[in-house]
UniProtKB/Swiss-Prot annotation:
Function: Increases viral DNA accumulation. Enhances infectivity and symptom expression.
InterPro entries: Gemini_AL3
Domain of life from the UniProt record: Viruses
Protein name as annotated: Replication enhancer protein
Pfam families named among the record's database cross-references: Gemini_AL3
UniProt family annotation: Belongs to the geminiviridae replication enhancer protein family.
Assembly description: Homooligomer. Interacts with the replication-associated protein (REP). Interacts with host proliferating cell nuclear antigen (PCNA). Interacts with host retinoblastoma-related protein 1 (RBR1), and may thereby deregulate the host cell cycle. Oligomerization and interaction with PCNA are necessary for optimal replication enhancement.
The keyword Endoplasmic reticulum is annotated on this UniProt entry: no
Any one GO biological process: viral process
Annotated keywords: Host-virus interaction
Keyword Cell membrane: no
Amino acid sequence: MDSRTGELITAPQAENGVFIWEINNPLYFKITEHSQRPFLMNHDIISIQIRFNHNIRKVMGIHKCFLDFRIWTTLQPQTGHFLRVFRYEVLKYLDSLGVISINNVIRAVDHVLYDVLENTINVTETHDIKYKFY
């Protein structure tokens, strides 16, 4: 859903993409929170934010695009190492597809968390997407 207007994002908007080789560093990855074994539970909670950079947003007609993922995992990774592996695997998957779009980034994250990395318990996704009016 577009955060500014409240309208649902259409399928053509979600699938609208850019060839990966046309833009350098198209995505920005950031770990916003890493709770290690909270409340004596046997899993970590890692929050990752993926931001589309200015050049890809300009081509796709997007004002703002943040994808936030909250990951429950039984792995005990170091924060920097997890981010490095996660980023590498997501970009590798997108490179194999050849096109970066909102849906392809979500597919790439799903592939990495459930097929590449082991011990993923649950993932929740929230987003802040705003399309340009003009």
